[in-house]
Amino acid sequence: MKVIHKLNRTVSLVALSLAMLIAPLQAAANRHPAKPDRRKPIEKRRQSNNSTRADRRRAEARRRAEAARLAAAARERAAEEAMREQVQAMIAKDDISGEDPEIRRIAVNALGDHAGTVVVMNPKTGRVYSIVNQQWALSEGFKPCSTIKLVTGLAGLNERVIDPSNTTAISDSNRVDLTHALAYSKNEYFQQVGGQVGFSKMISYARLMGLGEKTGINARNESAGRVPISKTGFAVNHMSSHGDDFKVTALQLATLVSTMANGGKLVTPFFARTAQDETRPTAKVRRIVNIDSDSFQQMIPGMIGSVSYGSGKRAFDPQATVAGKTGTCIDHGTWVGLFTSYAPLNDPQIAIAVIARGADGRNHFPAAVAGRIYRDLNSRLGVSGNIDIASKRPANPATSVADTDTDTDEEEADAGEVVNDTSSTKVNSNKPVWGDQRKTAESKIKRTVMTLPSRPTQPAINNSPNQRTGRVSGRQ
């Protein structure tokens, strides 16, 4: 018992001693609370810092990009405004002697304060009724963009490369014929045609239609424009749909389409500045172009289709049939829009070419300008409102390819007009390629054109040594 008693006493003393030792430590701890652990994982802190810095960098990059975008937009607006002011100053300097006052007023109002030029002439006689912004129309060369397809189409038809009765594969699942290709300005179609016609033949037809030479108008400072000197490989194809390395004036476009309207006479345009000019009985013809009359006829349905339901529908005139071709692309860093046309179909009295630059070159503004002029001239042209069946639009144009194929169709899809335009309208084995309404309109246009008076047949251009043979047909 004594041993146990001593042991208990010893334990008590030890416990008391420990309590006396711990008490000061606890008091000190209460006076100085433990500091938080500063040893946070270094990697975690580093990741957090990196993430914060990255967020700041991204935010700064977005801010700078937005600032750059706004600055670029401001510069573009300033440049557009300066160009429009410059154009208005040019128009004020136009020599209007020999112009038709009423037609000039209509053309000036149609162009408004936009940066562009307008040519209105008689496709049969060559008389120029008005040129708004004569400096641009006579002296300034523009890339023709898709208006070059008029030359490509004529070359393909005359060289028997195009079979207008057949469709052509322009992608794995899309087929079009000449009428559809012209109406919607299909690049691949005309690239195939140009590649088969060949470079030298393409240039021969371009020169034949008046490109690369002065028109001979009785006005100063006319430019001859430019045609390409040499191209090989796919560059020939691309040139045939985009007009690469061509330079054309608005007056050249007007005389080109006049040649198509009058059946193959390349007339010399003129201002009626003398009494002799006023009473000139016949046109001064530079040459009769050696293109078969059927080739001109076969181009007409696509040109009417362009205006009635295609890329040039902003020129649509509900009282008269207009045949035309659009063009849109980038030339020297700025947008260029073109439209060349004639009307009425059965008795062409007016040819109009419009070219616009900058923002005004987009959205087929030139076609809208021409359309306004045609509509304002209807009474003068003797159009009574009995519209030719050829110019009727589909009843529901919102369902047509024109609203899915955006010259924006293929023309504005990229900076230089697209090389490979894949239409959003594809061939489906269970559905027709085109809507029934548009298909009916195209059929009526073709039937109407077949009833037009035939024109004298001219001998074809002789084949060149590098001429490739073959037809654009459904077997491609």
What kind of feature is each model-predicted range?
Residues 236-244, 248-272, 278-285, 309-384, ...:
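Active-site beta-strand/loop architecture of penicillin-binding DD-peptidases
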Residues 163-186, 254-309, 381-410:
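Conserved active-site-proximal loop/helix segments of enzymes involved in bacterial cell-wall
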Residues 69-122, 205, 211:
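Beta-lactamase-like hydrolase cores
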Residues 116, 170-254:
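Active-site-adjacent helix/loop patches that line small-molecule binding or acyl-intermediate pockets
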Residues 3-14:
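Bacterial N-terminal signal peptides that target proteins for export
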Residues 28-93, 380-476:
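Compositionally biased, proline/threonine/alanine/serine-rich low-complexity intrinsically disordered stretches
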Residues 12-22:
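Bacterial N-terminal signal peptides
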Residues 107-110, 126, 140-165, 181, ...:
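Active-site SXXK
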